Structures are given as structure tokens and as C-alpha cells.
Regions:
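Aromatic-rich carbohydrate-recognition surfaces in CAZymes
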Residues: 123, 300, 400-408, 412-488
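Anionic coordination/interaction segments
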Residues: 1-394, 406-414, 418, 454-459
Length: 488
């Protein structure tokens, strides 16, 4: 309950809450429906290991999940551009960030390899029977198979259930700070279908939800998008997170308790037992961003619903993203551009060995992971650090000198600017705030000259030696002997 002084006595406000805003469980017209049986399409997979393998071109890793089958651990794709990205596993569990994958998470991150919980879920609901399921294997797994395809800069989930053929494609544009989700739905049954598609995101807007829950508040943009802010995140001030869709009919809530209920949980959200979300936003809630839209499909009819989750530095930036990506053609154009970007980068160097498996890894996947996961995202399922490591990202930069020399050059100069005037360096630091640690790790000092020499040899760019950057200044580290003395 959110109480405001201007609305009068407590007794009046609680009556309003229990009257105007209360909504009853919906009574569904029928219970149960015969589900169409689908045969999983034949897949040409190389090196199939019982769970998945590469497609015939080696450009996608394809995972096949049938009833009762799970990968040994979460198998994920780290998808990013230079300022924004998300991690998604084969179950559909996902976390999204902007600018810093640890310090500025938009949604929750978890590295629990058993449960693999998600901060973002797309639910479906049959408006006739009330049955709910998720487009991805998590959190509501159905009996029919799932096909998951991790590609360069995108992931796709294919699934058929309840007469509906689903195809969900998730990606980030080449430069915009927004995650785009194309949900393609086709009615494969012989009857008209009315469905709800619901995007649920547990907001963080910081490092961990436990530390930001009391600071995040939600509101409605004049264009219908949901906005979330955290004015206490001083490292990323003024940022506005938004959730939007191309669909016109929409209902929403920013109250996680309303959506999940006291005993509902992700598998049985209480709000989905009711007709629609309550259109409640504001402060004082356990926050989330949840958006519901309703779709009607005739037999064999197909439609596309676009969900977008992103961040802008101003309301104008958010408005521009919403306007741009409510247009489905522009979304597909952005997808084509993202695929073309990775195709161009990854084909610049081709390696041919007698081992086909080695060729697949060397001609795409290793370089893709180095750039998307290591240099840009600096995150993974095991560890979500967000920081630049002085030696780590210099090592990574060596892998891209021949294909993206500008990125390697930028990385060298960035690390040069994190040297102290005494000659030691920041072992790691967070972009934005530049918070980090100062150490005496000696191997850090070796990597800057080593990588610079390699860069010059491979590019001929001796001008980099003429570049000037500033040193860091701070109180010098204490003498190591003085530091150790109390322990001797």
C-alpha cells in the first residue's frame, strides 16, 4: 500500500485501495484444451553431444531440449555492444545491463547453475482457458520440445504449444542501448485464439536488488512506456530504464507483489490468474516492470510482438528509442545490421586446419567471445565483474589487433591512463566511476609494453608512442616491509 498525505485519512486510503484497485480472479470459460502434438524438425547438427552442436555452417550453436532433458550446466550467450548487453542461457534466464555489467544492472543477475533463475521472462496466457506457459524453457516447462539457437549477436527460441508456434529472437543493435525481443506467433490450430503476452522484468538499477529495492520507482511515459529510475545510483545519475512494446493494447504494473503474489512465484504468478494487470506504478513497492498485451489470431494467422528493454540518459533518448523500435521493419533492420556487423568482423581472418572442429572455433566463436564477452561485456555466468582488469583486457586486446586495430589501440591508451605517477597501476577499475584497487602485482606492469610492441609490429602504427595521457595521482602505497612488520 502506498499512502500519501494529500489523499486523506488512513481509513479512506485503504478503502480506495481495496475498492478501486482491487481486482478479482477471472473465471475462465473452459478448463483444459487438447494440445497439438508437434514433431521436432530435423536438424543438421555437427558434433551432437546429446544436448546440442553446431549447425552445418558453424555459425549457430543449436540446443535441443526435450521433456526431462537439461544441459549439464547453463549454456549461455553473452550478447553486447560497446555500451549495453545481456546474458541469456538455454533456459531463457537472462540479465541485462547498461555501461557496466555489475554496477549498473537493469535486471537481476544470478549464477546459480542448478535453478538458473531469471530476471526477465515472457509469459503467454490462453485467454479462453487461463492456461499459462513461458516462451522459453524457464520457468514453465511444457512437454513439447524446445530448439535454442545461440548465434553471433543473437539468440533464438523455438517452441510449439497449445496450437501456437512461437519464435523468440533476442539481440542488441550495433550501438543503441536497448535489448530487442521479436516474438513471432502463429496460430497453427483450426480455431481463433486470444492470447496475452506478458514481459516481466525484476528491476535492479544498480548492483543488487537488495540494495536498490527501496530506491527504485516506476512511472508511465506519456507515450505508454514504463519508466524506472534510481536517483540514488550516483555512479550513473539521471539514467532512465524503460520497457515498451509495439502493441497498442497494454496493461502494466510496477508492483512485484501484485504480479507474483505471496505464494505464487515465477511458475504461478498470481496476477495471471486475473483478467489484466492493475496499471499500478509508483514508489514504495518491491519494484518490477511488467507489461501485458492482448493478441487475437485467426487460424493460420501470424503476428509479431516487439518488446524492448533499455536505458536512456534522458527522456528524449527514451522517447527516440520507443518511436524507432515500435516499427517492426526497423527492428528487423537493426537485427540485419547486427548480424552483418559480426559477419564482417569475424570473417576478416580465416584459419584452415585439418581439424574441422578447430576451424569452427577459430573462425568465429573464439573471436566473438573475446570481443562481446571479454572486452565489451566483461561478464559471464560464472562471474559478473563489470570492471576492466589491467592485464586481462590487454591480453584480450591482442586477439583483436588484426581485425579491429582501433579497439586494440583504444584499449592500450585506456590502460596507459590508469598508471600512477610512481609507476604502479590500478589492478582493476570500474568504467564510469573509475573505482578500483591499487596493488603491487608485478605482472600487470609487463603487459602494457608487451601488447604495445605487438600492436606496433602488426599495424605499423608507431604514432601511438606519441600519444599523451595523464597519470593517476594518489597517496603512494606503503612500503611492503612496513606493511608486513606487524605480522612478523
Amino acid at each position: 500500500i502506498v499512502l500519501k498525505g494529500k489523499y486523506g485519512p488512513l481509513s479512506v486510503q485503504t478503502k480506495v485501495r481495496n475498492g478501486k484497485n482491487a481486482f478479482e480472479y477471472k473465471i475462465w470459460k473452459s478448463k483444459g484444451k487438447k494440445h497439438n502434438k508437434y514433431d521436432i524438425k530435423k536438424l543438421e547438427i555437427k558434433n551432437f553431444n546429446g544436448f546440442g552442436g553446431f549447425d552445418k555452417e558453424g555459425k549457430e550453436y543449436v540446443i535441443k531440449l526435450t521433456e526431462g532433458v537439461n544441459t549439464p550446466v547453463p549454456w549461455c550467450n553473452v550478447i553486447s555492444n560497446q555500451k549495453f548487453g545481456f546474458l541469456i542461457t538455454e533456459s531463457g534466464a537472462s540479465t541485462t545491463w547498461a555501461e557496466n555489467s555489475r554496477e549498473n544492472r537493469l535486471t537481476t543477475w544470478s549464477n546459480d547453475p542448478v535453478i538458473d533463475p531469471s530476471g526477465e521472462i515472457i509469459y503467454m496466457r490462453d485467454e479462453e482457458t487461463g492456461e499459462i506457459w513461458s516462451v522459453t524453457p524457464h520457468p514453465i516447462r511444457t512437454k513439447t520440445p524446445y530448439i535454442v539457437r545461440h548465434g553471433f549477436g543473437y539468440s533464438v527460441f523455438e517452441h510449439n504449444w497449445n496450437g501456437i508456434e512461437h519464435e523468440l529472437t533476442e539481440f542488441v543493435p550495433v550501438s543503441d542501448t536497448v535489448k530487442l525481443c521479436i516474438l513471432k506467433l502463429r496460430n497453427g490450430s483450426n480455431t481463433k485464439m486470444k492470447l496475452s503476452a506478458i514481459y516481466y522484468a525484476r528491476t535492479v538499477l544498480g548492483v543488487y536488488e537488495q540494495g536498490t529495492v527501496q530506491h527504485v520507482y516506476t512511472e508511465l511515459h506519456s507515450n505508454g512506456a514504463i519508466l524506472a529510475r534510481n536517483n540514488y545510483n550516483t555512479d550513473f545519475p539521471g539514467r532512465i530504464v524503460f520497457l515498451d512494446t509495439n502493441a497498442k493494447e497494454r496493461y502494466y504494473t510496477g508492483d512485484r507483489r501484485e504480479f507474483l503474489g505471496n505464494i505464487g512465484g515465477l511458475k504461478h504468478p498470481e496476477a495471471l490468474r486475473k483478467d489484466k494487470l492493475s496499471n499500478t506504478l509508483g514508489a514504495g513497492f518491491d519494484p518490477c516492470m511488467c507489461l501485458q498485451t492482448v493478441i487475437e489470431l485467426k487460424p493460420r494467422e501470424q503476428t509479431e510482438v516487439v518488446f524492448m528493454l533499455g536505458q536512456g540518459e534522458s527522456l528524449e533518448a527514451v522517447s527516440a528509442y520507443s518511436e524507432r523500435y515500435r516499427n517492426v521493419k526497423r527492428v528487423y533492420k537493426a537485427l540485419d545490421e547486427a548480424k552483418a556487423f559480426w559477419e564482417d568482423v569475424l570473417r576478416k581472418v580465416t584459419v584452415l586446419t585439418p581439424d574441422e572442429n578447430m576451424n569452427i572455433l577459430l573462425n568465429g566463436w573464439l573471436l566473438y567471445q573475446t570481443l562481446s564477452c571479454r572486452i565489451w561485456a566483461r561478464t559471464a555466468f560464472y562471474q559478473s565483474g563489470g570492471a576492466f582488469g589491467f592485464r586481462d583486457q590487454l591480453q584480450d586486446a591482442m586477439a583483436v589487433i588484426d581485425v579491429l586495430p582501433d579497439i586494440a589501440r583504444k584499449q592500450i591508451l585506456l590502460h596507459a591512463s590508469h598508471q600512477f605517477i610512481e609507476g604502479d597501476v590500478q589492478h582493476w577499475w570500474h568504467p564510469g566511476s573509475n573505482k578500483g584497487i591499487r596493488t603491487r602485482f608485478s605482472d600487470d606492469l609487463l603487459w602494457l609494453p608487451y601488447v604495445t610492441v605487438n600492436y606496433i609490429k602488426r599495424t605499423g602504427d608507431v604514432q601511438i608512442l606519441e600519444e599523451r595521457v595523464e597519470f593517476l595521482e594518489d597517496e603512494p602505497l606503503k612500503d611492503i616491509k612496513a606493511h608486513r612488520k606487524p605480522w612478523l
